[in-house]
Amino acid sequence: MACLGPSAQVPELPEKNCGYREVQYWDQRYQGAADSAPYEWFGDFSCFRDLLEPELRPLDRILVLGCGNSALSYEIFLGGFPDVTSVDYSSVVVAAMRARYAHVPTLRWETMDVRALGFPSGSFDVVLEKGTLDALLTGEQDPWTVSSEGVHTVDQVLNEAGFRKRTSRLLGLHTQLELVLAGVSLLLAALLLGCLVALGVQYHRDPSHSTCLTEACIRVAGKILESLDRGVSPCEDFYQFSCGGWIRRNPLPDGRSRWNTFNSLWDQNQAILKHLLENTTFNSSSEAERKTQRFYLSCLQVERIEELGAQPLRDLIDKIGGWNVTGPWDQDNFMEVLKAVAGTYRATPFFTVYVSADSKSSNSNIIQVDQSGLFLPSRDYYLNRTANEKVLTAYLDYMEELGMLLGGQPTSTREQMRQVLELEIQLANITVPQDQRRDEEKIYHKMSIAELQALAPSMDWLEFLSFLLSPLELGDSEPVVVYGTDYLQQVSELINRTEPSVLNNYLIWNLVQKTTSSLDHRFESAQEKLLETLYGTKKSCTPRWQTCISNTDDALGFALGSLFVKATFDRQSKEIAEGMISEIRAAFEEALGHLVWMDEKTRQAAKEKADAIYDMIGFPDFILEPKELDDVYDGYEVSEDSFFQNMLNLYNFSAKVMADQLRKPPSRDQWSMTPQTVNAYYLPTKNEIVFPAGILQAPFYTCNHPKALNFGGIGVVMGHELTHAFDDQGREYDKEGNLRPWWQNESLAAFRNHTACIEEQYSQYQVNGEKLNGRQTLGENIADNGGLKAAYNAYKAWLRKHGEEQQLPAVGLTNHQLFFVGFAQVWCSVRTPESSHEGLVTDPHSPARFRVLGTLSNSRDFLRHFGCPVGSPMNSGQLCEVW
């Protein structure tokens, strides 16, 4: 059977075969490429994927010759190979492909003649072509021999070692033409290759060799130039100056409500994980890693999931006692349903219960209870009903549709779901806003279970917590930390005055919300309609494998991290990162010594806390020890044929893990993020900063990039997390991670004065006419400002020790200016208006634009290096500074 992929209509052929060698023919052929479907010569990637994949590695640098209007390069990316450069004779089709795949930054597109490739020798590990050499053959006298002009240039750009590695196997199996078709390797399309000759002349004329002309420097210079908007003055709007080009080149991908550096890097990490999990030769000595593959494959079994439909959830609801929306239910079982929904299946109706370090005694774990129970992202969506009418209507439609899919009747389902929504609105009314919960000293309340029972008597707390933490034995004297006593008291009163049928509907609705992502496409389609209203996503085209990677990361993230780290993480990165943290910590402590508002006793305690901050880089050590890794997931049963059951088993397993933690001290090996995560965090109860392997990559960090970019990228992230130890919440914890007052009153008053300046500054910023909440974002804004200052001071210290760096070619920036541009370009972002609104009401971070503008307008160093005068938009003349 012929293997043909979906293609556009076949274009007209040239009058003579030799026309295939003429660029004019190809330019004319591809005039409509930007608006047409891909066209595949011979067949698509699936036709030869099985032949090719055994020869590829996730980090191979791949060059695709004569890419044309084919989807091959994108399909290779989706197959788990992110580093792909594509060239074509036609500048018309190259422009079209750049536009079509602008949302995938690791796909690079260049206009080149394959007979004269402009890449340095050894640039690629794999070279692929599908029909390009056929075009060259139209001018050959012998149709079985490719002239040296094509083969030699391919041989030259291949990595020699990589070519030899595969030659012994391939030469015996394939002809010369097939060998080139099978191909072998890439890293780097130099985006400024057109300038290489001129730059080389300049280099030889300059005896100091002050311009860096390495491949890495040329490539990163090209990326920086692509992102800049030179039409905007840096003193007018530095975010637009730094990111205007990036924003033009990065329209929102379908199905996304936001797109930024973090999303892009996570997509790359996911592609690597996909390749690892779908490897047909997968073989591991770790049972946890084998569970990871089984879980992932169960998620991919779409036919099985569709076949089961809604039945798994219907059976579960019947097992719990029924749901008033869909049929008979047990009217006297509120506690039993609550225990099942919140205990066995870990949903969070009314409140959330978890085990974590006691903030006031951080060497021990304790039961903690906090507010919860709302499905929409924020209480604001429920309370401002006029402004959010579309969202509330879409949410009710979603509730009704799911109720109907599970067996509800048209005449009653909407009314019963409306009652559940009204209950959530009442919950929203008593939910405390996030900006009023920032003082942890005020919201922390330790009490016994007996005291909790007196506070919120509508349910039996000892019975509930004993079930939740079984087999542990609890008594009335067991300590519990409650965050928000007023909330729990009012929740208890709300439960008492609500009809049992509405309580049942609400509890089961919480279970339905948690489990429908494991069901068939009808439930996914229903959710997509709600997400379109809530976040502005136009349509979802997320491949199933990406959804399954995310699910696997949630379920078995550290076993998945073991695979990721072994495949990608350079151990030297850990040493380099630790060195950078030391430099940034030293810069922060030096700045502490110059703070005029802080008394000496508080300053000394702050220095001791900074010294005591423990840094965790890359991954926790246990993930590379198979037995230790297996022990972490011991007891979690995973099969390859039931994704829904795997998810139920996960909820039950996580409840057991939580119970197991209560009588144990907190462990430093217990990370809150998996190694592949593109993020970082500070944990006050451990006084530690954590930088997973996933973020120790470009654009945050690359070993052969200028230090200005590394300090402006990962350096600012490090400074940000370190400064969290001293933001409005972190500063309440001492060096041991305990919540206690350690500041002198005079310094505390001065601190609050300085942070009030930050709060007021950010409260003036607006997005689509809506003001930021400077109180809600205060901690992150303090960390952004302090992190930038610490990283820049660390960079200056590095320069004093090592001397000035070479400058990047063509960008026209000093290295000091480059530091600030590098920082800003980390935050280049696009977002729908709906998603922007959601961020304003839920996110403790300021929007990306103001993380740049707010921070840099407070930086004397930035204002000096860019010469921004007082009165310019970037220099109001009033600087807010805490650290």
Swiss-Prot record:
Keyword annotations: Cytoplasmic vesicle, Disulfide bond, Glycoprotein, Golgi apparatus, Hydrolase, Membrane, Metal-binding, Metalloprotease, Methyltransferase, Multifunctional enzyme, Phosphoprotein, Protease, Signal-anchor, Transferase, Transmembrane, Transmembrane helix, Zinc
Activity regulation (UniProt): Inhibited by phosphoramidon.
Lumenal side: 200-883
Signal peptide extent: none
TM regions (residue ranges): 179-199
Cytoplasmic side: 1-178
Membrane topology term: Single-pass type II membrane protein
Glycosylated sites: N279, N283, N324, N384, N429, N496, N652, N745, N753
UniProt subcellular location: Golgi apparatus membrane; Cytoplasmic vesicle, Secretory vesicle membrane
Cofactor binding note of this UniProt entry: Binds 1 zinc ion per subunit.
Tissue and organ distribution: Isoform EEF1AKMT4-ECE2-1 and isoform EEF1AKMT4-ECE2-2 are expressed in liver, kidney, adrenal gland, testis and endothelial cells.
Catalytic activity: Hydrolysis of the 21-Trp-|-Val-22 bond in big endothelin to form endothelin 1
Molecular-function annotations in GO: metal ion binding; metalloendopeptidase activity; methyltransferase activity
Activity sensitivity to pH: Optimum pH is 5.5. Inactive at neutral pH.
Entries under Pfam families matching the protein: Methyltransf_25 (PF13649), Peptidase_M13 (PF01431), Peptidase_M13_N (PF05649)
GO term, biological process aspect, one: brain development
Disulfide bridge positions per record: C212-C217, C235-C868, C243-C828, C299-C548, C757-C880
Binding, Zn(2+): H720, H724, E780
UniProt-annotated stretches for the region Methyltransferase-like region: 1-160
Phosphotyrosine: residues bearing it: Y39
Cellular component terms (Gene Ontology): Golgi membrane; plasma membrane; transport vesicle membrane
Documented EC number(s): 3.4.24.71, 2.1.1.-
Family recorded in the similarity comment: In the N-terminal section; belongs to the methyltransferase superfamily. In the C-terminal section; belongs to the peptidase M13 family.
Biological function: Converts big endothelin-1 to endothelin-1. May also have methyltransferase activity.
Protein name in UniProt: EEF1AKMT4-ECE2 readthrough transcript protein
Organism: Bos taurus (Bovine)
Lineage: Eukaryota, Metazoa, Chordata, Craniata, Vertebrata
Primary gene name: EEF1AKMT4-ECE2
